[in-house]
Swiss-Prot record:
SUPFAM superfamilies: Ribosomal protein S16
PANTHER family according to UniProt: 30S RIBOSOMAL PROTEIN S16, SMALL RIBOSOMAL SUBUNIT PROTEIN BS16M
Biological process according to GO: translation
Protein name per the record: Small ribosomal subunit protein bS16
Gene Ontology cellular component annotations, sorted alphabetically: cytoplasm; small ribosomal subunit
Pfam families: Ribosomal_S16
Length: 83
């Protein structure tokens, strides 16, 4: 099954996440099909906190990709920002 989920990056105590489309059998930070955005939970000031390609996310959802709980919240937030 294909899932849209977060892959962790960044340094220790400074998390940074990529929104990835990947096979659910692969590891969290492993091989992915497509990277559709990023999420920086520790962004400060003018740093960009969230960027998502909503068109690609919608495309993968139409093809049947499952969305993780946290990514669903982030997609909702991104749609709100865009409106």
């Amino acid at each position: 099954m294909v899932t849209i989920r977060l892959a962790r990056g960044g340094a220790k105590k400074r998390p940074f996440y990529h929104l990835t489309v990947s096979d659910s059998r692969k590891s969290r930070d492993g091989r992915f099909i497509e990277r559709i955005g990023f999420f920086n939970p520790v962004a400060r000031g003018q740093e960009e906190r969230l960027r998502v390609d909503l068109e690609r996310a919608a495309h993968w959802q139409e093809l049947g990709a499952q969305v993780s709980d946290r990514v669903a919240e982030l997609l909702k937030e991104a749609r709100k920002q865009q409106a």
